[in-house]
Regions:
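Loop/turn residues immediately N-terminal
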Residues: 13, 61-63, 102-103, 157-159, ...
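Loop/turn-rich, solvent-exposed surfaces of beta-rich toroidal or solenoidal domains
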Residues: 134-206
Length: 245
């Protein structure tokens, strides 16, 4: 981002976040994440808003946002899923952070201008920094997708759907078996696509009701997130690349 590359290096013994100058690799800053993060797998989010560019890192036991220029901590949230994999993303001008492991599966929706410890609770799921949150509803491997008014999450064989603005639950339903969602969900043309490691692609009609409309056999497992470009959806299976109009 603007001649910066940011790397998350969350080795449990010596975790750190480092920013390098993209043009020559010079280290611009480095911050220790000791006692901040033991595990983190997702790609950091870089988001620019109101003159501040922040780096949001999903992690456990803390989700933390840093100032891209200095590495200074901006805001943090404690105690999500203990093996966070989904990458943070922006929709509706807010930052969505999701995890699900170790008995916890939160969704946090954060205002970019948040500062300090903004950890929500069961009794107070929103605050000055958090638009809404739920302690049960996140996904383990798959990064969700916001499409229209709703956020869709693939968690193993379950599809979860919430109103993306209010957090109101729309549905939590099982896909036709077998199904296990590793890849991130994608959406286009009024449809949600959930690629399964059980050699199929489940297609749902977008909206607040659970409406599966197809289960397409692919012949091979799918672990990679589908890509959509110029009216074509691309699926990378374990052995093939498939393009469908």
């Amino acid at each position: 981002h603007k001649n910066h590359i940011v790397l998350t290096c969350d080795d449990p013994a010596n975790p750190f976040l480092v920013a390098l100058r993209l043009s020559d690799g010079k280290e611009l800053w480095r911050v220790s994440r000791k006692d901040i993060c033991e595990r983190s797998w997702g790609t950091p989010l870089i988001h620019e808003s109101d003159g501040t560019t922040q780096v949001v890192v999903n992690g456990w036991p803390w989700v933390v946002s840093y100032d891209l220029k200095t590495g200074e901590e901006l805001w943090k949230i404690n105690d999500g899923g203990d093996n966070p994999i989904p990458s943070p993303f922006v929709a509706n001008g807010w930052i969505y952070v999701i995890s699900a492991h170790g008995g916890k599966s939160p969704i946090y929706v954060v205002r970019p201008e948040a500062r300090g410890d903004i950890t929500p609770s069961l009794d107070a799921p929103s605050n000055d920094g958090v638009v809404w949150s739920t302690l049960k509803g996140g996904s383990y491997m798959s990064t969700p997708v916001v499409y229209g008014d709703y956020i869709y999450l693939g968690h193993y064989s379950t599809i979860r759907c919430f109103n993306a603005t209010t957090g109101e639950e729309a549905f939590i339903e099982k896909l036709p078996q077998p199904a296990s969602i590793i890849a991130s969900l994608v959406a286009a043309d009024g449809k949600i696509y959930a690629a399964s490691e059980h050699e199929s692609v489940h297609v749902l009609s977008a909206g607040p009701d659970f409406n599966p409309i197809a289960n397409n056999p692919m012949g091979e497992p799918i672990f990679a997130t589908p890509a959509i470009s110029e009216g074509v959806i691309y699926f990378r299976t374990t052995q093939s690349l498939v393009a469908i109009h």
